[in-house]
Amino acid sequence: RVAVLLPDEVGRNRFYYPPLWQGVRDYLKNSEDLNVECTEFSFPNEIDPFHSRGVEEVRALLAEDKLDGLLTVGHMEAMTMQEWQHARDAGVAVVQVGFRNPKIAPLCSVQPDYEVIGRTMAELIFSHIPSFGSVVLCAGNPKWEQHARIVQGFEDYMQENGAQNRIYLDNSCCIGSEAQRNILKLLEKPDVAACCSVLSQGSVMLVQGLQQCGKAGKVFAVGSDVFEENLDALRSRILDNIVQKNPYAQGYLGIKALVEYLVQGKAPEQRTIYVGSEVVFRSNAVMYDRDNFRGLLL
């Protein structure tokens, strides 16, 4: 028996997690002949999932030794170390998507190369703005290593290429009125020539801020993750590019690795399986419409 425990697909989670869930479901649909019972569990609050119903149900199953495998995200403390230790002692196979948490000792993780994403964002921006232009960077939560690694890649690219542009950092990680005001205040600075975000919710606030301050289409802007609002902003020339982290492939390959291990005894060849990230332009945005991404991103 396998459990999938991920953030749900509504509210603030709707910008990133639906393709991840879809990847899981597509693989399982194509593997119905395998002897796998998979149950979905979700939680609404990505910041503090510990007390959500979905997490509590999975914790109970683990405590009662009723699970053989678990697919979950790697960047959150959904369970205590004692509970993870019990799962390891019971032989539960854990695959993480999005980030590898070595404290949990997962079978493997499936994730993008976040530092490469940061370098890609930096290269896009610094090939389009003058050396004196400043950049607003929505850097997300510095305690989440996937956000921090994108920022690190961005800064490494700057250092290696001699870019001395000023960077205005915003560490908001959720859409909110205060976060929106902070981002707007940064965008209104007269020296800002570009902006980008390491996370989907930051992209939403960047787009709103650019529209509010009258700089939409005048500041080079790079968004994060493919969802309808970002695609609309790309088509409307508010965003110039989108860098997507391929959550569909993360979900598909994550559940595939878990099922193959449990059913066939096939261990993953690598502890960390990297999925490719891609740059979306207006010219290729159509490839991400209407589920075209399913074949494109595997």
What are these regions (language model features)?
Residues 69, 91-95, 108, 134, ...:
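Proline-centered loop/turn at the N-terminus of a beta-strand
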Residues 7-19, 39-55, 75-76, 110-120, ...:
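Hinge/beta->alpha junction and helix N-cap segments in small-molecule ligand-binding domains
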Residues 55-89, 153-154, 166-233:
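Hydrophobic alpha-helical
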Residues 29, 86-89, 159:
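Anion (oxyanion) recognition and catalysis
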Residues 142, 158-161, 246-298:
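Hinge/cleft segment of the Venus flytrap/periplasmic-binding protein
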Residues 25-39:
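Signal peptide-proximal N-terminal region
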